[in-house]
Amino acid sequence: MSSIFGKLREFVGFGEPTGYDYDYDEMEGDDYQGLYPAEPAQSLPTRSEEPHPRPSEPEMRSPVNTSAVTSTAMNPPMNQSMNNVVGMPGSGKWWGAVAEVIVMEPRSFEEMPQVIQALRERKSVVLNLTMMEPDQAQRAVDFVAGATYTIDGHQERIGESIFLFTPSCVQVSTQAGGQSHTLRDIPQAQIHTRPPAPAWTAEPLSRIAQ
């Protein structure tokens, strides 16, 4: 009876050989895995833990000498300061330098501009006019005196037809009676002229007439 059902199952297709089942089971095992090449295992990309960048440390700089910087700003180099100095017009000497005195003995009025130029260069001038005619000498004195007044200079007579003219930067003083006075403080002596008295009077004449 069992053989009949077995044949019927084989005929219909329900009955499969046991070997086939066994092979199928084996294929489901290790042999099944051998049919396809094994794929290499792909490692998941792991994000490398990069260390956070450390903040850059400030550079150690040598301390700046502030006093030196201040002194350099306040006191520029000597060459630079000398190049930036603008001299006064007509001034050839620095303040505090040795004063220069020029002695001139002109022979004509045409030489007077040289005296004015020397005063503009802040030089003192001793003017000796003894070599000039009296009228020319008086004209020369008036001319130089006017120019000296315009530059705030000083003038003084120091001898017969000899005059001293100085710029405003020169202080001239003289000693009289043991006391020192500036030339501009010495009062000018006033000369009063009057006719000389006659050696004889009218009284003797009256007596002679008698």
Curated annotation (Swiss-Prot):
Work out whether the entry's keyword set contains Protease.
no
Task: Write down the Pfam families for this protein, in alphabetical order.
Answer: SepF (PF04472)
Q: Where is the composition biased (Basic and acidic residues)?
A: 47-60
Subcellular localization, as worded in the UniProt entry: Cytoplasm
Q: GO biological process: any one?
A: division septum assembly
Compositional bias, Acidic residues, is annotated for 22-31
Where is this chain primarily localised? cytoplasm
Which stretches does the entry tag as region Disordered?
13-78
Q: Which UniProt keywords apply?
A: Cell cycle, Cell division, Cytoplasm, Septation
Comp. bias intervals (Polar residues): 64-78
An example GO CC term for this entry is: cytoplasm
InterPro entries on file: Cell_div_SepF (IPR023052), Cell_div_SepF/SepF-rel (IPR007561), SepF-like_sf (IPR038594)
- Describe the family membership recorded for this protein in Swiss-Prot or TrEMBL: Belongs to the SepF family.
Query: Quaternary structure?
Result: Homodimer. Interacts with FtsZ.
Job description of the protein: Cell division protein that is part of the divisome complex and is recruited early to the Z-ring. Probably stimulates Z-ring formation, perhaps through the cross-linking of FtsZ protofilaments. Its function overlaps with FtsA.
Q: Which protein are we looking at?
A: Cell division protein SepF
Query: Which organism encodes this protein?
Result: Cyanothece sp. (strain PCC 7425 / ATCC 29141)
Query: What does the organism's lineage look like at the top?
Result: Bacteria, Bacillati, Cyanobacteriota, Cyanophyceae, Gomontiellales
